[in-house]
Every structure is written in structure tokens, then in C-alpha cells.
């Protein structure tokens, strides 16, 4: 965008045409491998943690720090009625027990009693033990009906950047890790208000969750290892920008009129993109991921829900691996692997869940 504005000084008419062609062509091919990142000041704002949010000189990336004084976070400058939210993220290394790094959408600041939320939350661990993460969904303040799933990763998220994405449309929600869809929620009529329906902002935060994040609160944040640094770059926001329909500094007061906004064109664009459709290869990758790396699912937690929530798709092969608590029967974070089978796979260099696109 900045290069385009600069070129306007050369030939106004010609460059406007080029800009329009480029915008159309980029949107047509937009997918997980071709995402349009924004500059921080084009769509994001500082949320909290004075001094602990550090922007890069090129304004394409940002570091969020946690120290003994405060965590930090940023928020999208606008609210969106459906959208695709994505970022390359690198997590802190070494001892990270008690830490949560979150990438999520929410409207809790506007709809205090009936907020919606979609979460990707990374849970820190003791040094030498892997990060874990969870996804969750709340609709219309249904916090007493949490829909969380917990997983491990097939890589070390503190060594290099990986892309994490949330797709939210009128009919489905998909959570992505790189090019692998890890969870799909299809909207059911029986869900009623439990499906997120109100405009949300994008958030990214790092904070002290010593009371629950690691082993149920057994291990907390050790600030002798601080500062803890998480990094976000090539952040993408695509969706129906509701805030633009209510200009002014206090436009959140008018967001309640969101039903009057027509987002059909934006929704159609979202639902026609690559990241809204799970290919057969990606479906296989998702199944493998869930078989090997998911260690808790609310859909199989029959103590919590005697009848699974309506959006749950009960997969017999998955269900047989879980206790009635929703956790794996084997007591670990993944099923045991027979030695012979493990030996055959020892020389594999590609991740078993890669969509191989």
C-alpha cells in the first residue's frame, strides 16, 4: 500500500489502474500460501503493557513481552462481522510454565453479558517439555458451556515461526495451523445463540496464567527467566469491517446495530477462498492430526456433557481412545506407539500431518 501511494506521484492515472488490477488479482488467489499481511498501523492498536509491545522498524511484526510487571497485547482497530484472522507466531523458549500466549477474537468489551469468542491459546510448560495449545468457542455469553479441545504440536513453536489462523463465516469455523485444518465447526440450527454471531475484534496477548495454565496451576511463572518474548508477524485481517459503518471515536456504542449492515459480499468472498474449503488431502491431514495430537475434547467428555453439544461429530475411532472425562485412555498426551511401528517411521522427515500442498 505504501509503495502504491508513492507511485501516485509519478503517474496518477496509470498507477490507479495498476493498483486496482493488483488488488483484484491478489484477492482471487488469496489462500493460506498467499495471504495479504498488513502493517501494524494499518489495522492494529496497542492494548496493554506499556513498553512491553515492541514494533519492528518495518512495522510488519511486533513482539509481546511478559515480565514481572506486566504482560502485553494488541487489538484490531476495527471490529469484524465474520473474517479470516491469521499470523505467523513464534513462542518463548525454555521455561514457560504458567504463561499463556493467546491469538483470538472477542467482543467482550462491547457485549459484556453475552459476548462471543474464538480462541487459540498456547499453554507454557516446564523447560524441556513441549508447549500445548487449545481452541475454544463461545457464543452469546455461553461461558458455562465451554467447547475446548487441547492438543500437542508436531514441531517446536519456539524455534521458528508458524502460521495460525481462524476462519469465521456465517456457516462454519475452521482453525488452521500452517496449511493443516485442525478443527472445523459447522453451524447447526440447534446451537441457537451458541454460535458466534456478533462483530468481534482480533486480539493477541501474553499474560501470567499461573493459576491454571500448566498442570492445573501446579507450576507458575518463574520471572528469573523473564522477559518472555512472543513474536507476531505478517498479520492478516480479512472480513466485513463493521467499525467503518459507524465512524467516530465512540463507534462501539453503535455496534449493536450491526444487523443493519450488509456483509453479503464480504461473506461470499470469505466462503469462496481456499482457506474456507478443506480439500481431501487436508481432510486426511486433519484426521491424522486429531488422531495423534488431540488429547482432550469436550465432545467426548460425557461427565461434562451427557449428550454431546449439537455441533459435535462423533468419530468412533476417536471416541474409543477417550475416557468419559474427554481425556485419552492411555494417561499421556498421545496413544502408545508399538515399537515396530515406531521404528518403521523413524526415518520420516516430513510431518505426518502435513497437507503436502
Swiss-Prot record:
UniProt keyword Disulfide bond present: yes
Modified how: Contains at least one intrachain disulfide bond essential for its enzymatic activity.
Alphabetical UniProt keywords: Apoplast, Cell wall, Cell wall biogenesis/degradation, Disulfide bond, Glycoprotein, Glycosidase, Hydrolase, Secreted, Signal, Transferase
Glycosylation sites: 140, 241, 262, 347
Stored PROSITE patterns: GH16_2
Subcellular compartments: Secreted, Cell wall; Secreted, Extracellular space, Apoplast
GO process terms (BP): cell wall biogenesis; cell wall organization; xyloglucan metabolic process
Region called Disordered, residue ranges: 326-357
Gene Ontology terms, MF aspect: hydrolase activity, hydrolyzing O-glycosyl compounds; polysaccharide binding; xyloglucan:xyloglucosyl transferase activity
Residues with site note (Important for catalytic activity): 119
UniProt xrefs under InterPro entries: Beta-glucanase/XTH, ConA-like_dom_sf, GH16, XET_C, XTH
E.C. number(s) listed in UniProt: 2.4.1.207
Pfam families: Glyco_hydro_16 (PF00722), XET_C (PF06955)
Signal peptide residue numbers: 1-31
Compositionally biased region (Basic residues): 335-348
Principal subcellular localization: secreted
Miscellaneous: In contrast to group 1 and group 2 endotransglucosylase/hydrolase proteins, it may not contain the ligase activity, and may catalyze endohydrolysis xyloglucan polymers only.
Family membership: Belongs to the glycosyl hydrolase 16 family. XTH group 3 subfamily.
Function, as annotated: Catalyzes xyloglucan endohydrolysis (XEH) and/or endotransglycosylation (XET). Cleaves and religates xyloglucan polymers, an essential constituent of the primary cell wall, and thereby participates in cell wall construction of growing tissues.
Protein name, per record: Probable xyloglucan endotransglucosylase/hydrolase protein 29
Protein's organism: Arabidopsis thaliana (Mouse-ear cress)
Amino acid at each position: 500500500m505504501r509503495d502504491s501511494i508513492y507511485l501516485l506521484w509519478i503517474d496518477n492515472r496509470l498507477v490507479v489502474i495498476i493498483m486496482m488490477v493488483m488488488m483484484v488479482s491478489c484477492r482471487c488467489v488469496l489462500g493460506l500460501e498467499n495471504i495479504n499481511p498488513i502493517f501494524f498501523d494499518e489495522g492494529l492498536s496497542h492494548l496493554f503493557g506499556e513498553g512491553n509491545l515492541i514494533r519492528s522498524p518495518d512495522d510488519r511484526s511486533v513482539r509481546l513481552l511478559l515480565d514481572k510487571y506486566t504482560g502485553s497485547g494488541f487489538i484490531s482497530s476495527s471490529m469484524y462481522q465474520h473474517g479470516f484472522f491469521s499470523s505467523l507466531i513464534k513462542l518463548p523458549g525454555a521455561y514457560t510454565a504458567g504463561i499463556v500466549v493467546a491469538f483470538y477474537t472477542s467482543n467482550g468489551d462491547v457485549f459484556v453479558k453475552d459476548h462471543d469468542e474464538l480462541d487459540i491459546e498456547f499453554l507454557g510448560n516446564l523447560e524441556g517439555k513441549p508447549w500445548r495449545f487449545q481452541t475454544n468457542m463461545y457464543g452469546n455469553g455461553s461461558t458455562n458451556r465451554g467447547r475446548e479441545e487441547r492438543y500437542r504440536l508436531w514441531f517446536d513453536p519456539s524455534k521458528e515461526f508458524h502460521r495460525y489462523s481462524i476462519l469465521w463465516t456465517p456457516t462454519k469455523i475452521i482453525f488452521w495451523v500452517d496449511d493443516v485444518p485442525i478443527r472445523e465447526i459447522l453451524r447447526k440450527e440447534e446451537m441457537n445463540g451458541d454460535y458466534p454471531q456478533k462483530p468481534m475484534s482480533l486480539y493477541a496477548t501474553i499474560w501470567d496464567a499461573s493459576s491454571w495454565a500448566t498442570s492445573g496451576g501446579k507450576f507458575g511463572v518463574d520471572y528469573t527467566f523473564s522477559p518472555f518474548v512472543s513474536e507476531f508477524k505478517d498479520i492478516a485481517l480479512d472480513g466485513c469491517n463493521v467499525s467503518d459503518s459507524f465512524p467516530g471515536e465512540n463507534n462501539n456504542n453503535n455496534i449493536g446495530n450491526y444487523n443493519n449492515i450488509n456483509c453479503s459480499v464480504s461473506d461470499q468472498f470469505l466462503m469462496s477462498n481456499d482457506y474456507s474449503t478443506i480439500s481431501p488431502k487436508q481432510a486426511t491431514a486433519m484426521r491424522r492430526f486429531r488422531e495423534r495430537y488431540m488429547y482432550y475434547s469436550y465432545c467426548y467428555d460425557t461427565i461434562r456433557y451427557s449428550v454431546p453439544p449439537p455441533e459435535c461429530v462423533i468419530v468412533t475411532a476417536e471416541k474409543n481412545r477417550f475416557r468419559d472425562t474427554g481425556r485419552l485412555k492411555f494417561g499421556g498426551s498421545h496413544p502408545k506407539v508399538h515399537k515396530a511401528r515406531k521404528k518403521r517411521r523413524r526415518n520420516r522427515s516430513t510431518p505426518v500431518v502435513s497437507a503436502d500442498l
